[in-house]
């Protein structure tokens, strides 16, 4: 096995892995990594690939650079990486054209307003919501809807949701529209662009095994496990976000009887099923034993505990409303088991550094900005430079949304 650092530009991790696998003549499951990176960014991470020499990796460096991928820091590895096997992520961000909101204090300067918002986040943290990228960019169908259909073991419906097109006549949506209208997997495969790895894997399986229940099962199984489980996690993330909003609306920032608190450090997300949690007692509340920073909420699954207060019935009602029972988080046909995990209610940025660029010219990221190349963009408004770290699975977009008080 060999490890490498890996940079991708405007590309999903899973599509990048598929591209590398194709170049190396291996399968995507030969790669292991600690997390899925955002598409709309220049991202770097460590990966491990088995049964591939360093020389083979060096040989593809020039060809993949044309596909917005770079590999570097090649070295031998002795073990695979696991999802969640990282402390967190570091972000470097420039926000351009910063201006005051209409409701802002007219006496406060823009710099004062911005720095005050950042310091509040630094001091109090922010609600640890899953960011919008967890649910996909689709307007007609989002990934949590596909995940719910999979959990209900309606694999045919899930596949139709998977191929539901968005507005527009680009090649991808034309191909999806053709499949929805004809269910002709072979013809759709010819229309689907090469870079749409997931769609092409599914279409190949449908072309071979048919569009019935058995064919749809094999089509879902044609996707690597990490791809299949993402849809389930997306649905569970939606439930967690809604639970967090209900928790804060009902109890605010107070620790209350029946809350779950973590007795371990929560530095991981989807691999943290076994964190020790404690149910807060009346005595704990009276003595202020725990802080709001220790409160966790469960991601639904078959092995998690649920809070012993109004949140318990909320979870039950939410899952029943979606046609699920508490224990139905196993899908044998797709080899998917979802034990659940615990996620901190609040997150805090650390190693936070910020700087107001003001009248300076602002660095504009190019496709290869991550390795030191950049160009200057003339200033058209105030700009803020931010760098900070977040624990695994906390979202920079959510942190920025709280600072900016608008969608990111």
What do the PLM-derived regions correspond to, one by one?
Residues 1-408:
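Non-catalytic, substrate/partner-engaging modules appended to enzymatic cores
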